[in-house]
Curated annotation (Swiss-Prot):
GO terms for cellular component: cytosol. This is Translation initiation factor IF-2. The keyword Cell cycle does not apply. Residues 69-92, 128-352 are annotated as: Disordered. Residues 448-619 form the tr-type G domain. It holds the Pfam family IF-2. GO terms for molecular function: GTP binding; GTPase activity; translation initiation factor activity. It comes from the Bacteria. Residues 557-560 are annotated as: G4. It comes from Lactococcus lactis subsp. cremoris (strain SK11). The keyword Protein biosynthesis applies. It is found in: Cytoplasm.
Length: 950
């Protein structure tokens, strides 16, 4: 058997189309239905040769049978058959040539009989229509017997014929008999042998239908044509000549007699009353299967007609299409004016439903960073979509609620021709601006205020004693060690005028407190002891006052002492830029010699203060919200955070919402310097208040806000910023400080937790401890706060291995018990220099001890003894010093140290001894060393601890 090939494979090899190959194969009689079928090599050659040479199609056996019966076929019929091939289900349908010849003859007879058929048509139209009588089944069969016998053979082989073939067969049967004769005019009522079909002219039918149709109603012409065509395809027996357009009964074997009449009545609305042209035809009996096939075929034809007419460009418009157009017009015409209703949108209108007024663009726009598209659109009265489109064209995709940056806002405003002006946002949390802002105070409401005087000077020069004389109280007696620990604010009245005094510590640890005191003061009283003269803190006070631009009044104190020398003090002050008024009238300072202990010249000093204050013309506005500075702050167990404030501008009232430093609250209580509760405090008034959420820092500013909500927001924002700054100041390891950091890993540190009574003392103590310089040890302040020592402080100290230092505070009972359990060291002090001295001593003791090598003896090896399982024993003689058991030894050979180790054993003769003296012999073993030779030298030494120099 030869190899087979598929048609598509042959097409690829030869370059021919699959369709040509399949058609040629079928014409050659091969059983090939598609290009996927296989053929032999011989068949393939025949197919290819047939395609190339154009071989005629071989007739199939069914066609041969028909052609055998055909003797002569006219050329016209043959050409007609070739021009219009009839197909059914994609297959060729073979027709009898005799039938085609008869069809041609009948068509010629039809043309000749048209003139004779017109009088008959008029007679029929004048007669009264008669009801069609049921036609018996045998009559049409007898009438068309001859034609059936001819068509039977074709039907037997083709089995199924298209509706067009049926129509042609019926027409042949109709046209076989004479169409018009005089005898048939007389015998119209008689039963004819063949039914005559009288057809009206199509032009007349169209005119009558157009005249009977209403003007506003438009029907589909193609649908009427389809109905007529379908009626012609369903011939019926009607005795009165009425067709389907007027309700003619369609003959069906499986349908009741009255059903066709009802269907004709339903179709009556598509035809006019004058259209009475009908056709009484017959059809051969068909089975139920054929009827179903006919109905399916009619539906297919109807759908095909719809597709050809309505869905093709240029086809007639249907009623449904009209309705869709109206609906689309209603949806698209959204801006036409009209009321609600089904037909309102059909009314045309040129006025839009919503007309947006034209708004002119502003010349400039003050914008804020973070505005969105919707905000900008409202400001310039434009649609957000328009702005979004502009931004999209600029390469920025945003929505109307998205925040825009500064550059984008300016870009879109400039695109519209609007000048962008950035709105300067007022930082409400920045309370420092209120102290320098010009518009905050009302010039017309300014009144004279008391002067704020700060007393400064070196430690133990009499500052607190002087202030005590002013207040006529015994403040100094309450100070531990006679040293002022923290700042105090007091107000006195002399000659009808008030003066506010601030007392600052004189110890070197309180530098920051003196600087804060100078920043809020109007006048500085520099106290200098006449017997001591100018000291380091005196110079520091001078520098602080000059930096703040504050006038200085020099009070030379202790002039009552025997060694007092005011002239020497004046000379020393001039060396630091402080000159008496007699020496420098313009920039000179007032010098007053006083004795605070004996109340000497104090009134003169107060008069000098009032004189200098009057020259300065100190004023304030009591009508605004209060602002000022924190003098001191502390934590009380019962009252909470307590802050000493100095009001500088405005008036402070009870229940005022206030922001103090990085904390906030509401003024709960206010007390003056005498401990009395007050309801308001004016400018230059020192007060002590409660109600804050946390303890502020000394030197922080405070300001009163309009409501508590704003105060809370400002306080939280300031706390957040302070935390951020603290994090930024935290030292980070980088390549620059990596080596230093690694070196610090060898440095020991002492962890300290500081708890003090006031914030200023805690700050000063922390600064002083961090200044302690001991090589190899540093101070690490783990925590610093105000208030009593609590359980949380003990837990923190235990976790960080820290020492707790309490300054003027005591631990609670529970904290003391917990400290005993955790073995936490608590040191309580009330004098700052004692704290510093104690911590410095502890830091020096934390250092590792220093050792120095001390040579105690020297010996020479005289003999060596090797003992199994023991090692080498060296016999030696001490030539200098001594050899001890607890010492170390170096083995030196020819001036080179070959081993350095400990002595494992030491003997004098056979006895174990602790030492061998000078000029004595003995034996020893060097630990982990057996390579000892004669004449080696033993250098015996010890590491002696030496005391660290302070």
């Amino acid at each position: 058997m030869s190899d087979k090939k598929r048609i598509n494979q042959i097409a690829k090899e030869t370059g021919l189309s699959n369709t040509e190959l399949v058609a040629t194969a079928q014409s050659l009689g091969f059983e090939v239905k598609s290009h996927s079928r296989s053929v032999t090599a011989e068949q393939a050659e025949k197919i290819i040769q047939g395609v190339k040479t154009g071989t005629d199609t071989i007739v199939k056996p069914a066609e041969k049978t028909v052609k055998a019966k055909t003797k002569t076929v006219p050329e016209t019929a043959k050409s007609k058959q070739e021009d219009h091939p009839r197909t059914f289900a994609g297959k060729a349908v073979v027709e009898d040539p005799a039938i085609l010849a008869r069809i041609k003859e009948k068509e010629e007879a039809k043309k000749a009989a048209k003139t004779e058929a017109e009088p008959i048509e008029e007679v029929i139209t004048t007669e009264k229509p008669k009801v069609a009588e049921p036609v018996k089944k045998s009559e049409p069969k007898a009438a068309a017997k001859a034609e059936e016998t001819k068509v039977e053979k074709v039907e037997a082989k083709a089995k199924t014929v298209t509706p067009k073939a049926e129509v042609k067969t019926e027409n042949v049967a109709d046209k076989k008999e004479p169409v018009v004769t005089e005898e048939k005019k007389k015998s119209l009522t008689q039963k004819p042998r063949i039914q005559i079909k009288v057809i009206k002219r199509a032009e007349d039918i169209k005119k009558e239908q157009a005249a009977a149709r209403p003007e506003k109603k438009k029907f589909d012409k193609n649908r009427n044509d389809r109905n007529n065509r379908n009626d012609n395809r369903r011939p019926n027996q009607n005795g009165n000549g009425q067709g389907h357009s007027q309700g003619g009964n369609h003959y069906d074997k499986n349908r009741p007699a009255g059903q066709g009449q009802n269907q004709g009545q339903k179709r009556d609305k598509f035809a006019s009353s004058g259209s009475s042209s009908t056709s009484d035809t017959f059809t051969p009996a068909a089975s139920g299967k054929n009827n179903r096939r006919d109905r399916d075929r009619k539906k297919t034809d109807s759908n095909r007609d719809n597709t050809k007419d309505g869905n093709r460009k240029g086809g007639p418009l249907r009623v449904n299409d009209n309705r869709n157009q109206v609906r689309n017009a209603r949806n698209s015409n959204w801006n036409q004016k009209g009321g609600r209703g089904r037909y309102q949108n059909n009314q045309s209108s040129n006025v839009p439903a919503t007309q947006r007024k034209f708004h002119e663009l502003p010349e400039s726009l003050e914008y804020e960073v973070g505005m969105n598209v919707q905000d900008i659109a409202k400001s310039i009265k434009r649609e957000p979509a328009e702005i979004i489109k502009k931004l999209f064209m600029m390469g920025t995709m945003v929505n109307q609620n998205q925040s825009l940056d500064e550059d984008t806002i300016e870009l879109i405003l400039m695109d519209y021709g609007v000048t962008p002006l950035k709105k300067v946002e007022e930082d409400k949390s920045d309370i420092e601006r209120l102290f320098v802002e010009d518009g905050y105070l009302n010039e017309d409401k300014m009144v004279e205020r008391p002067a704020v005087v700060t007393i400064m000077g070196h430690v133990d020069h009499g500052k607190t004693t002087l202030l005590d004389r002013f207040r006529e109280s015994r403040v100094t007696e309450g100070e531990a060690g006679g040293i002022t620990q923290h700042i105090g604010a007091y107000q006195i009245k002399t000659n009808g005028k008030k003066i506010t005094f601030l007392d600052t510590p004189g110890h070197e640890a309180f530098t920051s407190m003196r600087a804060r005191g100078a920043s809020v003061t109007d006048i500085t009283i520099l106290v200098v002891a006449a017997d001591d003269g100018v000291m380091p803190q005196t110079i520091e006070a001078i520098n602080h006052s000059k930096a703040a631009g504050v006038p200085i009044i020099v009070a030379i104190n202790k002039i009552d002492k025997p060694g007092a020398n005011p002239q020497r003090v004046t000379q020393e002050l001039t060396e630091h830029g402080v000159f008496p008024v007699a020496w420098d009238p313009e920039n000179g300072s007032e010098f007053v010699e006083i004795s605070a202990k004996f109340n000497q010249n104090l009134e003169e000093l107060l008069d000098t203060v009032l004189l200098v204050a009057e020259v300065q013309e100190l004023k304030a506005d009591p009508s605004v919200r209060a602002i000022g500075t924190v003098v001191e702050a502390r934590l009380d167990q019962g009252k909470g955070a307590i802050a000493t404030l100095l009001v500088q501008q405005g008036t402070l009232h009870i229940q005022d919402p206030i922001v103090v430093g990085n904390t906030y609250g509401r003024v709960r209580t206010m007390t003056n310097d005498l401990g009395r509760r007050i309801k308001e405090a004016g400018p230059s008034t020192p007060i002590e208040l409660t109600g804050l959420s946390d303890v502020p820092q000394a030197g922080d500013h405070f300001a009163v806000f309009e409501d508590e909500k704003a105060a809370r927001a400002a306080g939280e924002e300031r706390a957040k910023r302070a935390q951020l700054i603290k994090r930024q100041n935290t030292r980070r390891v980088n390549l620059d400080n990596l080596f230093d950091t690694l070196k610090e890993g060898q440095t020991k540190s002492v962890n300290i937790i500081i708890k003090a009574d006031v914030q200023g003392s805690a700050e000063a103590l922390a600064a002083s401890l961090q200044k302690i310089e001991v090589e190899g040890v540093k101070v690490d302040i783990v925590h610093s706060a105000v208030g009593a020592i609590s359980e949380s402080d003990i837990s923190l100290a235990a976790a960080s291995n820290a020492i707790i230092i309490g300054f003027n505070v005591r631990p609670t009972g529970l904290a003391r018990e917990q400290a005993a359990q955790e073995e936490v060291d608590i040191r309580l002090h009330s004098i700052i220099y004692k704290v510093i001295e104690e911590v410095e001593t502890a830091m020096r003791g934390m250092l590792d001890p220093e050792f120095k090598e001390e040579i105690i003896g020297e010996a020479i090896v005289r003999e060596t003894f090797n003992v199994s399982k023991v090692g080498t024993i060296a016999g030696f003689m001490v030539i200098r010093g001594k050899v001890t058991r607890d010492a170390s030894v170096r083995v030196i050979r020819e001036g080179v140290v070959i081993h350095d180790g400990a002595i494992a054993s030491l003997k004098h003769f056979k006895d174990d001894v602790k030492e061998v003296g000078n000029a004595q012999e003995g034996g020893l073993m060097v630990e982990d060393f057996n390579d000892v030779e004669i004449d080696d030298t033993f250098e015996v030494y010890k590491m002696v601890e030496i005391e660290r120099k302070k």
